Amino acid sequence: MKTDLNMELMKNIADLYYNSNLTQSEIAHRYNISRPKVSRLLADARENGIVKIFIDGRNEISRFQEEQLLKRFPLKAVKVISVPHDDDQLALQITAQETARFFSGFFRPHDRIGISWGYTLYTMARYFPELSLDDISLYQIIGHIDNTSTRNHASEIIDLMGQRLHTQNAFIFPCPAVFDSPLILEMLLHDSKVKKLYESMLQCNKLIVSLAPSDTSCCLYRSGYINYSDLDLMNQCGSVGSICCHFIDQKGKLCDEGLDQRTLAIPLDVLREKEYLFAYVTSSEKVPVLYSA
């Protein structure tokens, strides 16, 4: 009996092979698996009727958009999902379900996975499929901002993902996301336990990041870490939004060095060096920062 994960992988590979005309070697490289495994999955797809069902039901517009994005940007993979435009909650649910299945196909044994927080990622974590992979570790890559008026679901995301991946190696940062001064943050990072956790987080090979627009809807504003004047100043500097609490402009450069020096999060330069960086958006407000990140 095929698992949901294998069924989804067969669908994706069948689509790339039969509809996008990729070779088995190209597909193997994209998914970091062997070419014989691709061949076996294609055979399984035929035997299970996946090829017929998937090709007949696939949204042609979404597939065209995916191929255009892959041609234009240096992406390993992309998935475009059709959602209703008149129901934001349903759109988020559909996107989160598809994203969870899509992202899970890239996880491997011994991965060290860093994950951000926020309601969008929390929704994805709720739908994440169960995987049995050896020696998986999870790390929160931004400090907390939970208070009485704002929740970022950081602990819940780590707990849910730890359950789905069957690992007890799941670690949170029990510290604020933003401090009053860089000196306080520097002193905290000298604590042996915090330092060890921070250094382990830096070694993550795959990151699931959060994106936010540069407006009053972002968590840092709603939780009181930054005010309207801070937002206004960053927007004057060309801010298009934030990735893991780093506010950037259209060229991907930091907009507020002072704020960044007080922020407990995986550094922007480290983030960009990772081989795998996962993100998903469900609203047009986050597209500018996705483009610039």
PLM region spans:
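Short, amphipathic alpha-helical "recognition" segments used to contact nucleic acids or chromatin
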Residues: 5-21
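Short alpha-helical "recognition helix" segments of helix-turn-helix
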Residues: 13, 23-33
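Key DNA-contacting residues within the recognition helix of helix-turn-helix
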Residues: 39-41
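Alpha-helical DNA-recognition elements
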Residues: 44
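Short Lys/Arg-enriched helix C-cap and helix-to-coil transition segments
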Residues: 50-65
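Ligand-binding beta-strand-loop-alpha-helix segment within the catalytic cores
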Residues: 67, 72-109, 133-217, 222-228, ...
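Gly/Ser/Thr-rich loops at beta-strand to alpha-helix junctions
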Residues: 113-123, 213-215, 283-286
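ATP/nucleoside-binding phosphotransfer catalytic cores, i.e., glycine-rich phosphate-binding loops
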Residues: 256-293
